[in-house]
Regions:
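Classical nucleotidyltransferase
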Residues: 96-206, 304-310, 314, 328
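Short beta-strands and strand-loop turn motifs
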Residues: 22-24, 54-55, 88-92, 117-122, ...
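A glycine-rich helix N-cap at a beta->alpha junction
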Residues: 75-89
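N-terminal catalytic cores of NTP/NDP-binding nucleotidyl/phosphoryl-transfer enzymes
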Residues: 10-72
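Phosphate/ribose-recognition catalytic cores of enzymes acting on nucleotide-derived substrates
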Residues: 196-331
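Short acidic-hydrophobic, aromatic-tinged amphipathic segments that line or gate anion-handling sites
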Residues: 2-11
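Glycine-rich, highly charged phosphate/nucleotide-binding loops
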Residues: 67-76, 97-105
Length: 331
């Protein structure tokens, strides 16, 4: 078990006694998760305690996911802090998978963490084989003097119940606009810009090429209006962009196989995000860049030649800039 202080990520020896701890996996840190953490924050304020989260590590031993992740742990920690948590207790699944519900409450929550209150969502399950639900958690915590708050389901502005499973499906289907409503922010990933042969520049549309970190979701193949962010001279810059996601996007094939291999991407599965950044003509190779998906523009398309390709990229760039301006204001 590792305890991090947020937002720095520094490891600390102990969680302050009497903390209010939100329980969950928190993939995506969506609106439902934020409601849980906000409840923990308010409970902590009332008790003069610290708000914290407990979660299973996606990068630790023994935990096997059957789906790609919405957020990596680094992103998750930053979002948890933004939502109100001040400590993150991260457990390797191998350390807790054999614990019965009663053992988890007694050994982890009561003895190791010394919490005063736990907060969870209605669907939270724990214990060996996920055998205990939120009602069972309340009963077990009552037995050892820990208070329990169960937060009801949260819906988005369209009235749909928010869940990580639904968000993954929406992203996979390319409906990033609906996913963004449940997340409460645009879906995004951050990764290093890969070096290529600069083929985009030869047709007047320089692009950056990125491969998300292993295990991360990418939307359905196609073209998206995006917001592109990176630091320049210590200042965060934001630009409108048109991103093409696919196995072999328009000019992303200029990313050599040895570069992809260094990123751990097999040739047969090299889904690349290739992004044209409107109004930017600088150098970003080797730098960390964040791409935020705003809206799907179109599916994949074959082109008869360079002229047709250039015309389509130009139309995509105009459409993407209009969407960006609607959300963020004119550049």
């Amino acid at each position: 078990m590792t305890i991090f202080s947020l937002p720095t990520g520094a490891v600390v020896d102990r969680l302050p006694t009497g903390a209010v701890v939100a329980l969950g996996y928190f993939d995506g840190v969506h609106l439902g998760h934020r409601a849980i953490i906000d409840t923990a924050r308010r409970e902590a304020e009332a008790r003069d305690a610290v708000p914290a989260v407990w979660m299973i590590s996606s990068e630790g031993g023994g935990y096997k996911r059957d789906s790609l992740e919405i957020t990596c742990e680094e992103e998750k920690h930053a979002l948890l802090y933004e939502a109100g948590a001040r400590y993150a207790v991260v457990h390797d699944f191998s350390e807790v998978r054999g614990l019965a519900g009663e053992e988890f409450v007694r050994l982890v929550l009561k003895e190791a963490l010394r919490v005063s209150c736990v907060v969870c969502g209605k669907n939270f399950r724990f214990g060996k084989g996920a055998s205990v639900d939120s009602d069972g958690l309340r009963t077990l915590c009552d037995n050892v003097g820990i208070d329990t708050v169960v937060v009801p389901h949260v819906t988005d502005v369209c009235g749909d119940t928010v869940s990580s499973t639904k968000i993954r499906r929406l992203i996979t289907d390319g409906d990033v606009e609906a996913a963004d409503l449940m997340l409460g922010r645009p879906y995004s990933f951050t990764s290093t810009v890969l070096e290529g042969k600069r083929l985009g520049r030869t047709i007047g549309f320089p692009t950056i090429n990125q491969v998300p970190k292993q295990g991360r979701l990418l939307p359905k193949n196609g073209v998206y209006a995006v917001c592109v962010e990176f630091f320049d001279g210590g200042v965060r810059r934001s630009y409108a962009g048109a991103a093409n996601v696919g196995v072999c996007p328009t000019v992303a094939s200029d990313v050599s196989e040895d570069v992809l291999a260094r990123e751990g991407v097999a040739c047969a599965e090299r889904r690349v995000c290739e992004t044209y950044i409107a109004g930017f003509d600088g150098e970003l190779y080797g730098r960390e860049v964040t791409v935020r998906f705003l809206r799907r523009l179109r599916g994949e398309k074959a082109f008869s030649g360079i002229d047709e390709l250039k015309e389509q990229i130009s139309r995509d760039a105009v459409a993407a800039a209009q969407i960006y301006n609607e959300i963020y204001g004119k550049q």
